């Protein structure tokens, strides 16, 4: 999908083809892989705001911490509102998942081809804080997704509102437009 900040087109349509007062559906996707490590989490606030709206009827699906893995990000294309509350990487070139990058796990074999080549769709961010409890800090290597992975997802966003709350979310055209 594309966004209005990007090139202003959506599958051959322009902004004028859409009713600005209509969102494709009331399904909300919240992807928050670092709640266990962040002091301030926006997910509960967003849910409270949606619950308080007169128009109501929002159905929220939220994935947090390690549940917010690579496979879950593929679901977001069918939601009317998407919230990505995560880390960005590489100056706006990638978005981090909560999935631990374990080269002995079965998932690694699935991802291996996407991690290789001159233009990989995925990468690995090293030594990322995934949780904090007092002075105990848990750091792991996690998968990150480049714009080519996101723009290659099956499905189309149903006139969705996308809130990209991660560092670098709009720094580079490829990730911004993905």
Predicted regions and their residues:
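Catalytic cores of nucleophile-dependent amide-cleaving enzymes
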Residues: 105-178
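A domain-level signal for caspase-like cysteine endopeptidase catalytic cores
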Residues: 3-121
């Amino acid at each position: 999908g594309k966004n209005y900040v990007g090139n202003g087109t959506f599958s051959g349509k322009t902004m004028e083809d859409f009713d600005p007062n209509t969102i494709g559906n009331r399904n909300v996707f919240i992807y928050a892989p670092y709640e266990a490590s962040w002091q301030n989490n926006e997910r509960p606030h967003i849910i409270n705001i949606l619950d308080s709206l007169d128009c109501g009827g929002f159905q929220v699906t939220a994935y947090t911490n390690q549940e917010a893995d690579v496979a879950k990000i593929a679901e977001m294309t069918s939601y009317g509102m998407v919230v990505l509350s995560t880390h960005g990487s590489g100056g706006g070139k990638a978005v981090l998942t909560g999935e631990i990058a374990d080269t002995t796990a079965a998932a690694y074999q699935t991802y291996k081809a996407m991690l290789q080549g001159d233009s990989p769709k995925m990468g690995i961010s090293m030594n990322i804080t995934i949780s904090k409890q007092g002075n105990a800090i848990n750091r792991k290597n996690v998968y990150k997704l480049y714009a080519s992975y996101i723009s290659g997802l099956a499905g189309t966003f149903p006139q969705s509102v996308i809130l990209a709350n991660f560092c670098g979310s709009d720094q580079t055209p490829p990730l911004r437009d993905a």
